[in-house]
From Swiss-Prot:
Keyword hit for Transmembrane helix: no
Protein name as catalogued: Ribosomal RNA small subunit methyltransferase G
Domain of life: Bacteria
Source organism of this protein record: Mycobacterium avium (strain 104)
Chain positions covered by the region annotation Disordered: 223-245
UniProt-listed Enzyme Commission number(s): 2.1.1.-
GO CC, one annotated term: cytosol
């Protein structure tokens, strides 16, 4: 098992709080992660130490790793079907993909991350936690990524980009009727109103804002859900039955 370690800290780099600052896992974590709670606890420790040292998480986030990051991510699990194949776009420190993989071992999870240092961190974390998760260095808009992962049941993301870009990246990675699940902030509804036309033009349907984890998160996770619509039937130039101009 490979240990997730720090990089050499630069002068004036972030001061890493002690692991004790994380505190014990909240009771809701035991309900979400069940027998894999120890794995979730270890992930929290990695985020609060190596994650801070390597610039993937701010030092001020350590005391709220559970509520703001891990539980906020895992709350989306209730929106996923059994055995769903999901791709985490712009995974960064592994949010939301790693908490979902811990909470739901039935899921097939791919972590997609374009930056080398982040993808290396993700590979180390996945190895240390013993997760059956694939880490891929790449961007959602790249053709090789779309060719390989263009049939996912769900594309998840968290604080990656505005909905216009995120929809354009997500839809080509989904099977028809697959869903984009984007964890957003409290202004998610405003963002949906702003970009609804662009989202529809990019193939999104049934766009709505849902909340998850309201019984244990304050505030609950706010998620923009959108289904990939089936494309219209292509016109047939050979038969001449394409319709009128």
């Amino acid at each position: 098992m490979k240990h997730v370690g720090p990089v050499e800290p630069a002068a004036g780099g972030p001061e890493v709080p002690p692991v004790a600052a994380l505190g014990a896992a909240p009771e809701s974590a035991a309900a979400l992660f069940g027998p894999r709670l120890a794995t979730a606890q270890r992930y929290a420790e990695v985020l609060g130490t190596a994650g801070v040292e390597r610039g993937l998480l701010g030092p001020r986030e350590v005391d709220r790793i559970w509520d703001r990051h891990i539980l906020n991510s895992a709350a989306v699990a209730g929106l996923l079907g059994r055995g769903d194949r999901i791709i985490d776009i712009g995974s960064g420190a592994g949010l939301p993909g790693i908490p979902l993989a811990i909470a739901r071992p039935d899921l097939e999870v791919v972590l997609l991350e374009p930056l080398l240092r982040r993808s290396e961190f993700l590979t180390e974390v996945v190895d240390e936690l013993g997760l059956a998760v694939e880490v891929v260095r790449g961007r959602a808009e790249e053709r090789p990524v779309r060719n390989r992962f263009g049939d996912r049941d769900a594309a998840v993301s968290r604080a990656v980009a505005a909905l216009d870009k995120l929809t354009k990246w997500s839809m080509p990675l989904l099977r028809h009727d697959g869903r984009m699940l984007a964890i957003k902030g409290e202004r998610a509804a405003e963002e949906v109103d702003r970009y609804r036309r662009v989202m529809t033009a990019s193939g999104a349907a049934d766009v709505r804002v849902v909340t998850c984890g309201a019984n244990y998160l304050r505030p609950p996770a706010t998620v923009v859900s959108a289904r990939r619509a089936k494309p219209p039937h292509p016109k047939s130039a050979r038969t001449g039955k394409a319709g009128t101009r």
